[in-house]
Amino acid sequence: MEQEARPLVRRWEVLLLGGASGVGKTQVGYRLAHHFAVGITEVDDFQVLLERMTTPEQQPALHWRRTSPAFAQASASEIMEQSLEIGHAMRLGLEGVIASHLKEQTPLVLQRDHLYPALAAQTSYGSVTNDGRVRAVFLHEPDEQQIAANYLAREPQLGPQIKRARVSWLKSQWLKQQAERCGFPVVLARPWDTVLERLIAAVS
């Protein structure tokens, strides 16, 4: 059983906890926010909100999976590339959320799939400067079969999701490369029993 790590100094106001779908972010994200006694927001909630408030014509990237006939026939690489467009479509809104928390000095963890290193690397968010107050850490699972096993354990009623696991593995590789390019830490998702303390150390 994992022991809760001792509190370390928090030097950020907004922390982006990113990583591909199926690598284990959700389970550890809430524990990470609890450790630092800060709020946490799922970026997927913003995605659902935007999908309900827009049309496919207004935001094609957000609606592609649900409305495009091409989705069913698309390769894993094509789906991954298209999924990146979701984060790009949401970037302006996420900048506003980050700016608000920086101005109000209300610390927050933002987590989920569509957070990219370049967002945390920005020098400013509108008129609000970063000044090192926005940081990011990315959870990485290098084993495609493990991602497939995670999906099967989480959603056994759907059976093996081989193609979806491939998409997530490709995205995990892309996020790792981008994070390293921007100078943000990449933390291995396993071993699971030490992932919380390793995340805490990476962002403290």
Predicted region positions:
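Hydrophobic anchor at the beta1->P-loop junction of P-loop NTPases
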Residues: 17
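Walker A/P-loop
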Residues: 26
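Conserved nucleotide-sensing/catalytic segment adjacent to the nucleotide-binding pocket
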Residues: 39, 52-107
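Extreme N-terminal, non-catalytic leader segments
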Residues: 1-14
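NTP-dependent small-molecule kinase module
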Residues: 173-204
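A glycine- and Lys/Arg-enriched "phosphate-lid" helix/loop adjacent to the NTP-binding pocket
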Residues: 130-178
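Post-Walker A helix-loop "phosphate-sensing" segment adjacent to the P-loop in P-loop NTPases
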Residues: 33-44
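The conserved Walker
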Residues: 21
